[in-house]
From Swiss-Prot:
SUPFAM superfamilies: RL5-like. GO terms for biological process: translation. One of its GO terms (molecular function) is rRNA binding. One of its GO terms (cellular component) is ribosome. Gene3D superfamilies: 3.30.1440.10. This is one of the proteins that bind and probably mediate the attachment of the 5S RNA into the large ribosomal subunit, where it forms part of the central protuberance. In the 70S ribosome it contacts protein S13 of the 30S subunit (bridge B1b), connecting the 2 subunits; this bridge is implicated in subunit movement. Contacts the P site tRNA; the 5S rRNA and some of its associated proteins might help stabilize positioning of ribosome-bound tRNAs. Keywords: Ribonucleoprotein, Ribosomal protein, RNA-binding, rRNA-binding, tRNA-binding. Belongs to the universal ribosomal protein uL5 family. It holds the Pfam family Ribosomal_L5_C. The gene is rplE. This is Large ribosomal subunit protein uL5. InterPro entries: Ribosomal_uL5, Ribosomal_uL5_bac-type, Ribosomal_uL5_C, Ribosomal_uL5_CS, Ribosomal_uL5_dom_sf, Ribosomal_uL5_N. PROSITE patterns: RIBOSOMAL_L5.
Amino acid sequence: MAKLHDTYRQTVVQELMNQFGYNSVMQVPRIEKITLNMGVGEALADKKVLENAAGDLAAISGQKPLITKARKSVAGFKIREGYPIGCKVTLRGERMWEFLERLICISMPRIRDFRGVSAKSFDGRGNYSMGVREQIIFPEIDYDKVDKVRGLDITITTTAKTDEEGRALLAAFSFPFRK
């Protein structure tokens, strides 16, 4: 079991109950899922690019990514409806906790000139989104085998009702917010 999951059960729940005055343990916000998304615009010209991106995402997440297709045609971008343009992975349960632990403890400190993540990236309902410019910050990616440095989007979906609750939940996991 992931260390962060134990921390959540033993200390974070109690802290948040005291801080927000919840009556029940079930009212305490929890992390529902983590979604990793990689948009690959170059996939239109070369299909291999999408395969490499999917391979990177599979290595980072530990599960096979879903290839996302264009929802509608856009002439300006030269894409048609149904074209494969990216890949995504939704992590839940044990894999989610393990990924979050690796993200906070290993990957974020490896970001160049890292001073913390913005505390303003909440969506109004307690969910947090962030972008990573380089996939090579993850230890699962071998720098020598990377064909191109790509970024990815990470969305942490919580059951929090407000941004304040979501921020408190992530801060309890020592999420590195910028001061």
